[in-house]
Amino acid sequence: MLLLNNRRRIIGLIIGLLLLCTIFIFSIVLGYADTSFKTAIKAFQQFNGSNEHIIIKEVRLPRALIGTIVGSSLAITGALLQALTKNPLASPDLLGINSGASFFVIIGLFFFSINSLQAFAWLAFLGAAAAGLIVYFLGSLGNEGLTPIKLTLAGAAMAAMFSSFAHGFLVMNESALEEVLFWMAGSVQGRSLEILFSVLPYMIMGTLLAFLISNKMNVYSMGEDVARGLGQRTGTVKLLIGISVILLSGSAVAVAGPIGFIGIVVPHIVKWLVGNDYRWILPFCGITGGILLLLADIGARLILMPQEVPVGIMTAIIGTPFFIYIARNGGKSS
């Protein structure tokens, strides 16, 4: 833990916000089309309809906004899930959320010939929410109620089921593969602000709920027996965490598709910086998640110019070594 007191943590938040703003600006400027900081400033002050100005305002600005907000949502979701399940490798994949979203998109494409990104977004949100609710219900069965191990097992089972069904439908209809493959890889390219704004209220509600229960999560993280001994209603806390997870991850998947590793990597980096106080973990996760996804998106544009790599592949390249490191060290991030 590097930031040992609240004063240092506040300074760390300010530095993180400044770094996020800096990378956000670079995200608007960098890409296949050659633009400069001066051109970017003129695009906002004196828009003239040129190709450079259109690219900056209509393509890169929405892309940077979406990358920031989606990265933030995924990182906060990862922190919530790791607290809920006591699993240091937990992420939205754990609850079958990504698989559920992909399955609903493929169903819409296969049976109803839906192929627009706007429709994909709502199908993905419904699929993510349905998967999360089913897993939560299955994990709550039995006399003990919801337990981390039952939730993990239910999530793994549902993820496997949704993935199997989705791949089965794609094999039966290979023409649908090309239309959905880029979305399934996870990307912020070509996503409109209209899609983001349609789910933004759910993201805001999920984030506010997470911040409101952050102190209760500190008590819950001591162990359920200790939390109950201190008078906490652990069932209510787990339910609220689950609602926040579904709102945040469902919205993020709806906008950008299934993007992995942000939810695993960022909480460990943040815990190494600020310790185990969720009142600080969650805001730091929000900032760091936005930074990491923006960096991954910039790399996705530049690594194979003029071609673009889906940002989900870039996050996998960044996250896989870190994932292996965490697994080898038994999930200890600090």
Task: Give each language-model segment a name.
Residues 1-334:
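Alpha-helical transmembrane segments in inner-membrane proteins
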